[in-house]
Amino acid sequence: MRKLLLMLMVLLPAARMSAQDDPQYRMEIGAGVGTVSYEGDFNGNVLKNMQPMFSALWRYNFDPYKDLRLSATYGKLKGSSKDVDTYYPDYATEEYSFNRNLLDVSLVFEYNFWPYGTGRDYRGAKRLTPYIYGGIGATSASGGGSKSVFTVNVPIGLGVKYKLNERMNLGLDWGIHFSLSDELD
């Protein structure tokens, strides 16, 4: 009996018992709205030709500092050779413009600078945290009278998120998706 009690006293404190280990607390789903823009041959300013975009996401929280996010984004990409102030390439004398549907899917790793969460299982956690992310993605652009383009991209970005309550977050992020193709425009 003594051995059993001693073994329980040694092993029980080592057992991790926390709600954050339950799969339903580690996974999140969400939606987002924002703007999408393009910087390239026919747009030298990311603030020009901004278009609305919509996204859906799934996030898996490894711990209060690290997550993996899968997201799908839909928007429009617009550009025009009119009033372009970029140097390259040499533009033809005819005006060129495009308006394409854009679908982007990306998988990124997020790193929170402060432990993020609420409740007793997140000791020392904050409701607010800045974060950075990076990963890999794929983009499909179609429409506008041009052939469809499929390309790989490298998304990087930064943001801030705030935990409204145990089940709701509010986030704001800014990201760049570096396309590995010059055919989007």
Identify the role of each PLM range.
Residues 102, 165-185:
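Predominantly the C-terminal beta-signal and adjacent terminal strand-loop region
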Residues 19-61:
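Short glycine/proline- and aromatic-enriched beta-strand/turn motifs that initiate or cap beta-hairpins
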Residues 24, 61-65, 114-116, 163-165:
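Outer-membrane beta-barrel channels and translocator barrels
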Residues 26, 51-53, 102-106, 129, ...:
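Transmembrane beta-barrel architecture of outer-membrane proteins
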Residues 1-24:
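Bacterial Sec-dependent N-terminal signal peptides
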Residues 66-149:
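Gram-negative (and chloroplast) outer-membrane scaffold detector with strong preference
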Residues 35, 41, 54-55, 60, ...:
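Outer-membrane beta-barrel domain signature
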Residues 31-35, 56-60, 107-111, 134-138, ...:
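Residues on the lipid-exposed face of transmembrane beta-strands in outer-membrane beta-barrel proteins
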